[in-house]
Amino acid sequence: MKALVQVEAVKLSRSLGVFLLSIGMPVIFFLIFSSTVQFDDVTMQKAFIPSYMLTMTGFSMSGFALFTFPTMLAEDRKNSWLTFIQHSPLPIWQYYLSKLVRVLLCFVSSIAIVFAVGGLVKGVEMTAQEWVISALLLLVTSIVFLAIGLLLVQIQSEQAMSVVANLLYFVLAIMGGSWMPVSLFPDWVQRICKLMPSYHANQLVTTYAQEGDFLWKSLLIVLGYAIIFLGIALILNRKSEQQ
């Protein structure tokens, strides 16, 4: 297991550019929009910046789940590394755990860097408990994006997988309210947005940070989506292995 984690660490160091871009782009968006979007209501303005910080953190994490995670699995499938592991004495669960450790490191980096920018540059103020629980909620809700990433791996063409991943990346962000409040959309669009897992992931985190309320319904919806996506991915993977 230790050797597998070391391999993932080396691979991560070789893709440092992608790593920095996945965090840097949301940070830039956060700095630009938090400085340009102005509300007449002082209370709304004060609530907007920490809320936007949290949604941009989730946006960054979704990038790792939709691009880095499926890409590294697809590459291992292509270069027969997965086949080698399957025929080695190593349990296959250790292979997947090493992948999750790598993605978790990316997630934690996103949280640490975006939170640091929010606190040090934009003056976001939250209690220690609010910072910690917000980070934990972001990690929990990221499960649904990882499940979508597993679905993307089932696409055999790397080019098609990249196109679908990019489409999902921006659709989930926009329809989930990561870039702008869903309330600004027409009513019929809002109804669609409220069906999105990204919407409920954002609602769960931002509502806790703003009001201290825990939206159990949103948590259950996010976990429900994750279970459904994971189930479909496992079924498709099993069918692919049987062919």
Language model region names:
Residues 2-4, 180-211, 215-219:
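Short hydrophobic, aromatic-rich alpha-helical segments embedded in or entering the lipid bilayer
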Residues 22, 33-34, 203-243:
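Alpha-helical transmembrane segments of multi-pass membrane transporters/translocases
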